[in-house]
């Protein structure tokens, strides 16, 4: 179920403070975050945010087509490598 419009999008406070501070100074550094549930809002455009995938932080450049999506949608947490070629049990 989507979030109520009267509440507005969820963005972690620490992430919002860092982005507003960098926008005020005009800087562009990689921002590290564990907040995969934060929604991408227009002030994030042009920043690179390193999002945690459970093991490491992967840098993602934010563009205008990502607005409204969650940060966690762009970093996969599972690494599927496919089934083994010589595995006879999987073929049955």
From Swiss-Prot:
Biological process, per Gene Ontology: ribosomal small subunit assembly; translation
Pfam families: Ribosomal_S19 (PF00203)
Keyword RNA-binding: yes
MF annotations from Gene Ontology: rRNA binding; structural constituent of ribosome
Keywords: Chloroplast, Plastid, Ribonucleoprotein, Ribosomal protein, RNA-binding, rRNA-binding
GO cellular component: chloroplast; mitochondrial small ribosomal subunit
Subcellular location: Plastid, Chloroplast
Entry's family note: Belongs to the universal ribosomal protein uS19 family.
InterPro entries (UniProt xref): Ribosomal_uS19 (IPR002222), Ribosomal_uS19_bac-type (IPR005732), Ribosomal_uS19_CS (IPR020934), Ribosomal_uS19_SF (IPR023575)
SUPFAM superfamilies, A to Z: Ribosomal protein S19
Family matches, as Gene3D superfamilies: 30s Ribosomal Protein S19, Chain A (3.30.860.10)
Source organism, top-level taxon: Eukaryota
Chain's role: Protein S19 forms a complex with S13 that binds strongly to the 16S ribosomal RNA.
Species, as recorded: Nephroselmis olivacea (Green alga)
Record-given protein name: Small ribosomal subunit protein uS19c
NCBIfam families: rpsS_bact
